[in-house]
Design a protein with these regions (language model features):
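Extracellular/periplasmic Venus flytrap/periplasmic-binding protein
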Residues: 93-96, 103, 141-144, 150-255, ...
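Venus flytrap/periplasmic-binding-protein-like
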Residues: 87, 134, 141-144, 215-216, ...
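Segments of small-molecule ligand-sensing domains
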Residues: 313, 317-325, 336-395
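Beta-alpha junction/loop-to-helix N-cap segments that form part of ligand/metal-binding clefts
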Residues: 29-30, 54-60, 72-145, 155, ...
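Immediate post-signal peptide segment of exported/extracytoplasmic ligand-binding proteins
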Residues: 27-42, 75-79, 171-176
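Extracellular/periplasmic periplasmic-binding protein-like sensory domains
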Residues: 251-329, 401-405
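Extracytoplasmic "Venus flytrap"
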Residues: 32-36, 43-63, 85-91, 114-115, ...
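N-terminal export signals
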Residues: 8-27
Length: 407
């Protein structure tokens, strides 16, 4: 068979286009704001300061990721201009930052903006502007509703489903459960809470005490005292790392030893477990979907070896024990793949189209057996987790991979 050279093929296609009067789609370059022949602008907000500042490492690691991509030639020949702003975990500040990113910096999309309350504040704005709001750093179930909000997509397993899994596990494994709940008083906390109640079903009356805190509170000591005094023998901890560490440390000070279920967003050894005191967190249960860098079983895994080498080269000084650095690397890899799939069609519409077109994609640092799948009607990229129990200085996975369609 005669081998067709690229030059011959393109010339032939051009001739065909002249005959038919149609343009050659694959030869066209299409750009919206934030994209050009040389650059792709991506916007980001992160709490580099404030009560959730432990998540600041996510933004720093994402910056390092794009630096490494640019050093390797960029994405399809275009350098990434990553603009990351500090919103302090303050929704009103997030609005200010995102307006700047969209209206002044004119980014192609925002990526991994962090926090349920912060993303809630910009949700309607981004969809009204029809600017992609991709792979947000929050598991609220509202990020997976393409009919109502076609320009917003989540990333991690949604909080509602995660909470259902905790509830079902405790009902099956804790005898005579009396449950105390600590919850951040916003949409993030409420999403977990609603899922937890759904999972408990007819056993919802096992919740004997439910207390809340505000992200601006200095401590949650008084709330933990109330939970202990309720007689609860199970503690469902719906809090960000600062308060997760405080609450588990306070429980130990009070000699309160419930079975603790800790939301995934506060499972980092570096930012939550060590600050709480390792002796105070033995046996804590969480759900995971990413490889934990402190788990020795992954030491010989190719993904882990690649990540460690990358961290040492591009993110030197950052903790190899902080799961947030794994999260940032994994979600950046998904954004990277999305942009690669866009080719030269870097429009808002095509970015969303490609983000919604993954089928069982194997993402680096995700647990074996868990993949990324999306479609125009499914905006939940990852919908599976595995339970894990803290032992010694690390998490130990147990049981099977559990998947559930979000409700």
């Amino acid at each position: 068979m005669k081998k067709t050279s690229r030059r011959t093929f393109v010339a032939g296609a051009s001739a065909a286009a002249l005959l038919t009067g149609k343009s050659v789609a694959f030869a066209q370059k299409k750009y919206d704001n934030g994209a050009s022949d040389t650059e792709i602008k991506i916007g980001h907000t992160n709490p580099y300061s404030g009560p959730a500042s432990s998540y600041g490492v996510i933004g720093k690691t994402i910056q390092a990721y794009w630096k490494s991509v640019n050093e390797a030639g960029g994405v399809n020949g275009r350098k990434i201009n990553f603009i990351s702003l500090d919103d302090g975990y303050n929704p009103s500040k997030t609005v200010e930052c995102v307006r700047q990113l969209v209206e002044q910096d004119k980014v192609l999309c925002t990526f991994n903006t962090l926090g349920t309350p912060c993303n809630t504040a910009i949700h309607k704005y981004m969809n009204a502007k029809k600017v992609p709001m991709l792979f947000v750093a929050t598991g609220a179930s509202k990020w997976g509703k393409p009919k109502e909000f076609p320009w917003t997509m989540g990333f991690q397993p949604d909080y509602h489903t995660e909470a259902v899994i905790y509830a079902k596990h405790l009902l099956a494994n804790v005898k005579d459960a009396k449950i105390g709940v600590l919850m951040q008083n916003d949409d993030y906390g409420k999403d977990y809470w609603e899922g937890f109640k759904e999972g408990l079903g007819k056993e919802a009356n096992r919740v004997v005490k439910h207390v809340t805190y505000e992200p601006t509170d200095p401590t949650v000591d008084s709330q933990v005292i109330q939970l202990k005094d309720s007689g609860a023998n199970v503690f469902f901890n719906i809090s960000i790392p600062k308060f997760a560490a405080q609450s588990m440390r306070k429980a130990a000070e009070l000699a309160w030893k419930p079975v603790i279920y800790l939301n995934n967003v506060s499972s980092s050894v570096a930012s939550a477990m060590k600050p709480a005191g390792l002796e105070n967190v033995q046996g804590v249960i969480t759900a995971q979907y990413l490889m934990d860098p402190t788990d020795k079983q992954w030491d010989s895994n190719n993904d882990m070896k690649t990540w460690v080498a990358w961290m040492k080269k591009y993110n030197a000084g950052a903790s190899l024990e902080d799961a947030s650095n794994v999260f940032a690397y994994a979600v950046s890899s998904l954004m990277h793949e999305t942009l690669k799939k866009c080719g030269d069609n870097l429009t808002h519409e095509n970015v969303m189209k490609q983000a919604a077109n993954f089928q069982k994609f194997r993402l680096p640092m995700v647990l074996p057996g868990i993949t990324v799948s999306t479609s125009p009607t499914d905006y939940y990229p990852i919908q599976a987790v595995q339970l894990s129990r803290f032992k010694g200085e690390t998490w130990e996975l147990f049981g099977d991979i559990m998947a559930a369609e979000s409700t």
